[in-house]
């Protein structure tokens, strides 16, 4: 049984959909992996991603592990690879929101945040700003708090006038 990640639009809002029964089984497996004290051995997490590439939550877990260990290059790579999976599902013409209130959207929004923060730590401020702006467009309520780094990234990219309005 595959996870079968897809994207749906309802009244202008976007929603990632999947086989919920499969998701719950994968989430349980992910929780067991994350609970282990030997998480420095990431092979089980990498194997889960390889086996279920649409399971974005596993990518968030791996990326956050890299980020917490100051491995910003790998955190960025993991986030952007996960975003590539999700982006293939979002229609180019989609202009709506992807709300945090929908649990199904949270992994995608976390990947956007991780990509923004990793790029910022790597000094790739233009890329960081692009991810922040995209996240704010999709999720204007900004539950992940990227608005807090928006001004700094605007200044770092030379957009002083815009930064002053933030």
Annotate each predicted stretch with a short phrase.
Residues 1-98, 115, 119-141:
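N-terminal alpha-helical interaction modules that lie
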Residues 24-31, 61, 110, 114, ...:
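"A position-specific structural signal for the A-helix of alpha-solenoid helical repeats
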Residues 92-113, 144-157:
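TPR/TPR-like alpha-solenoid helical repeat scaffolds
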Residues 129-164:
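Hydrophobic, aromatic-enriched interface-forming segments
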């Amino acid at each position: 049984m595959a996870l079968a990640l897809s994207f749906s639009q309802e009244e202008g809002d976007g929603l990632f959909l999947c086989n919920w029964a499969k998701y719950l089984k994968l989430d349980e497996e992910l929780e067991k992996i994350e609970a282990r004290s030997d998480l420095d051995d990431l092979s089980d997490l990498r194997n889960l991603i390889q086996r279920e590439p649409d399971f974005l939550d596993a990518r968030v877990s791996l990326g956050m592990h890299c980020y917490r260990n100051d491995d910003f290059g790998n955190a960025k790579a993991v986030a952007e690879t996960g975003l590539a999976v999700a982006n293939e599902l979002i229609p180019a013409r989609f202009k709506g929101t992807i709300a945090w209130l929908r649990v199904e959207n949270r992994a995608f929004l976390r990947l956007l945040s991780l990509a923004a923060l990793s790029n910022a730590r790597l000094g790739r401020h233009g890329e960081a700003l692009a991810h922040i702006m995209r996240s704010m467009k999709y999720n204007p309520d900004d539950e992940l708090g990227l608005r807090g780094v928006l001004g700094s990234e605007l200044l770092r990219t030379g957009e002083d006038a815009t930064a002053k309005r933030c």
